Amino acid sequence: MKIGITIDISRLSLFVSGINQNAIYLALLLKEGGNDTYLIHVKDQDTKSLDQTKKLCKKHGLNRLAFNEVSSKKLDVVISLGVTISDVMANAWRNKNPNIKFISYKCGNEFFVDAETYIYKTHQERAASHSKITPVIPDAVWSIPQMENTNLHYYSFILGTENTTVVPFIWDPMLMEAALESNEVSIYDGRKINRIGIMEPNISLMKFCIPPAIIADRVFKNHKDIEIEKLMLIGANGIQNDLKFKELIGKMELYKAGKMSADARHATPFILDKYAHIIVSWQWENPLNYLYLDAAWLGYAVVHNAHLCKDVGYYYEGFDFENGEEVLYNAMKNHAEDSNYLAEQRKNITRYTRMNQNMVKQYNILLQDVVNDEFKRQVYDPLTNSVSPK
């Protein structure tokens, strides 16, 4: 099959943009399944992200395609992921290729983001861009597993179709391996763990830095046998001057001891190599995250509350900061001595990669169902990262 996947490579580095990573990982997986796969991009600017994408496409045998070239390729399926496909554009492509199918691949919590936009007037840039486009009604909507609970039926509502289903989660070690090859990061080497990194973007309640900071502060207060040299709030530079935020941070013993600092968002390899020996994370209704897989694949400890990947890193329950404290304490105390961690983590994470041939086959079946107009809603199994018809 000829498959096109939209990607926006005009702004963010691949190491920071989860959506662009998702597009490339999906393209690699579909290529593994024997499909002729293209990344469809809008802009062709000389940016760091574009350079990264060109190199990775060349290395892994992926094709790039401009939007105005889509009609000539006679694609069987176009997957809208990084860039929304308008109904006008879709109709133009259908005029030249009546059998073309459209899939909307959803990897963001649109319900939360829309609610925050309407109630708190946040995410205004996104709202403005979306208001300019009427998206095509897709032949199917695919949701990543962590969005299923809050968004599956919301996607049906906003896109005007009942053909919405969960699909397996995809990750790939390619970016971490590229960072290793270029010496941007190294495998965790057993060094003493005394620098903590928190990497929540702080643009939505879904990923907010205060809960993991509370967990780290509890360890600092209650466990004097653990040395914490620094707590880095990566991605908190946009809120660090907010009065309420400063009030919350000011209550923390780590802050009073001069051990906290805030910085802009950075790529995971950069943080792991330069600033953090361990990552502490918190999420709400986003229980799978590339950050956890990136860090664990490199052998670093990552403490998180994502229930769909409990066997990745070190898991604590939901909003239970006492449990988080216990888990972080044990990780800081014992991780350096765990010689099996790297191999075990890579074994656990493999189910999310194109090395999982069962997942490769499942995506081919899902594609064929769309082409044949045979929609089937799927049920997700987090232990195997697989789906089966409901």
Model-flagged regions — what are they?
Residues L65-F67, N237-L298:
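Donor nucleotide-activated moiety binding/catalytic core segment of transferases
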Residues K274-R354:
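Catalytic binding pocket for nucleotide-activated donors in carbohydrate/polymer assembly enzymes
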Residues L14-L29, F208-I215, Q362:
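Conserved alpha-helical elements of sugar-nucleotide-dependent glycosyltransferases
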Residues D36-K43, S104-Y105, W142-S143, E229-G238:
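Short internal beta-strands
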Residues F15, T150-H153, I158-K259:
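Conserved catalytic-core segment of nucleotide-activated headgroup transferases in glycan assembly
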Residues I7-S10, N20-I137, T150, D263-A267:
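Extended catalytic core of nucleotide-activated donor transferases of GT-like folds
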Residues H335-P389:
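A charged, aromatic-enriched C-terminal amphipathic alpha-helix characteristic of glycosyltransferases
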Residues F112-S182, Y363:
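A short, active-site helix/loop in glycosyltransferases that binds the activated sugar's phosphate group
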